[in-house]
Amino acid sequence: MRATAFEFRHRALLIGIIYWLAFSAYAIDHTNSVQAMVIWTVGSSSPHRLLAARGLLGLATLFVAFGALVRTWGAAYLRASVVHDAKLHSAVLVADGPYRHVRHPLYFASIVSTLGTGLMASRLGFVIMVGALTLLYLRLVGREEAQLHEQQGEAYREFRRRVPRLWPSLTPRVPGTGAKPQWGQAFRGELFMWGFALAIGAFAVTFKFTVMAVILSLAFLAFLAFLAFLAFLAFLQQQIVHNRRRRMARQAQTP
């Protein structure tokens, strides 16, 4: 099961479409997942229903926050510019940080986070979100592994033999290489995930959709600003490489 080049290049768009479809399912199924679970566990007339709802929202917050934490940890070693790049980078094998415990920590974290964000959707939306995103992540994993195997050869085969694919080992399975994590850029690259966790947590306390919407909007705008900054840096780097090649070409033509 392997994603196409189109799926990988436009994975952010596909994830956004799946989220839109999942939350749009409220038009068909009007019952929120948390509400449904509260009714199922304590009943619609129970005096403890608000406490149960807050508990489930707190659990959703923990799922998303844990996912954001693991994604930040992984991005600190992989680099946010690589995480959010449309191109597949397979020239270097990363074997530090969470990559010593699981081969695909970012996808593992995304699946865990989806369990939390899915609780904010309807029952049908939860099924759509968790099912479709998990399938997409598994397809993306398949494509990445195929290219890593092609590029890295025996080194990746050994890495794959020792390190679990998606379910992390509690203990490191390979020695680290001593790479230094870049925490600042990693955190900025996961601002939206952290914002989503904060928004759900705030809603669990206040039960006010406006508070959640404001936090999500601010986090999303900050995330877009960071992506624009990464794109600007990539443009500058391309210009530097282009100018360097032009200088070398002129020097080669000079008698």
Residue ranges and their predicted role:
Residues 1-96, 112-255:
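Membrane-anchoring alpha-helices and their flanking helix-loop junctions
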Residues 100-112:
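Conserved SAM-binding loop
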